[in-house]
Curated annotation (Swiss-Prot):
GO terms for biological process: ethylene-activated signaling pathway; response to cold; response to fungus; response to osmotic stress; response to water deprivation. PANTHER family: ETHYLENE-RESPONSIVE TRANSCRIPTION FACTOR ERF061, ETHYLENE-RESPONSIVE TRANSCRIPTION FACTOR RAP2-13. It comes from the Eukaryota. Interacts with BTB/POZ-MATH proteins BPM1 and BPM3. Pfam families: AP2. It comes from Arabidopsis thaliana. PROSITE patterns: AP2_ERF. This is Ethylene-responsive transcription factor RAP2-13. Residues 205-223 have a biased composition (Low complexity). InterPro entries: AP2/ERF_dom, AP2/ERF_dom_sf, DNA-bd_dom_sf, ERF/AP2-like.
Length: 261
């Protein structure tokens, strides 16, 4: 009975599923009773494939994960420190340049791997051009040996520029001294005639009058008339002809009064 049922089940299973015969042959030793034939048959059937769920899980693993804005802000690189006279090329190198004090043109100092090396090169050139008045990136390292030597061509250009600056400053100092000396000489020449007149003690008109031997000054002759001329009184031209003097003669006045009486 059991053998016939097994044969029937195998035959029907092979008709329904031609590829499951080998699986059933492997499971036959574990079948002990006819009651569990149906359960074994149900167990042997393959489960239907769920393509939708597998596709959803696969796409979930491949999809990009969302990243919050706070995480991007914290993970962003910090900006590098900016130095005077230093700028960065687009390929990552650092360039040092300096402006000349006269014509305000830029002098190229070199290309460096780090910004600190370029800043030190700028400090060396600035200190050579402006001395203690230079604005440096590292003022504490001014008198130390941290400054690396510049290129020979750049150093030669700096020496020539410093020499030209020294010559121009000397010329300006000389021109200012000459202009100040000319001003002083002109002021002394203007003051000399006044000193001559003051040392003489009198004006030229007075000295000429004294040298001619005259007893009176020409100013007195111009302002006063001749005192020797007779002045006729307007009320009586013939009354006092005998007395040309301006003094009063009381005797003549008394005689005239007695004659009138």
């Amino acid at each position: 009975m059991t053998t016939s049922m097994d044969f029937y089940s195998n035959k029907t299973f092979q008709q329904s599923d031609p590829f499951g015969g080998e699986l059933m042959e492997a499971l036959l030793p574990f079948i002990k009773s006819p009651s569990n034939d149906s359960s074994a048959f149900a167990f042997s059937l393959p489960a239907p494939i769920s393509y939708g769920s597998d596709l959803h899980s696969f796409s979930h693993h491949l999809s990009p994960k969302p990243v919050s804005m706070k995480q991007t802000g914290t993970s962003a690189a910090k900006p590098t420190k900016l130095y005077r006279g230093v700028r960065q090329r687009h390929w990552g190198k650092w360039v040092a340049e300096i402006r000349l004090p006269r014509n305000r043109t830029r002098l190229w100092l070199g290309t460096f791997d780090t910004a600190e090396e370029a800043a030190l090169a700028y400090d060396k050139a600035a200190y050579k051009l402006r001395g203690d008045f230079a604005r440096l990136n590292f003022p504490d390292l001014r008198h130390n040996d941290e400054y690396q030597p510049l290129q020979s061509s750049v150093d030669a250009k700096l020496e020539a520029i410093c020499q030209n600056l020294a010559e121009t400053t000397q010329k300006q100092v000389r021109s200012t001294k000459k202009s100040s000396s000319r001003k002083r000489s002109s002021t002394v020449a203007v003051k000399l005639p006044e000193e001559d007149y003051s040392s003489a003690g009198s004006s030229p008109l007075l000295t000429e009058s004294y040298g001619s031997g005259g007893s009176s000054s020409p100013l007195s002759e111009l302002t006063f008339g001749d005192t020797e001329e007779e002045i006729q009184p307007p009320w009586n031209e013939n009354a006092l002809e005998k007395y040309p003097s301006y003094e009063i003669d009381w005797d003549s006045i008394l005689q005239c009064s007695s004659l009138v009486n």
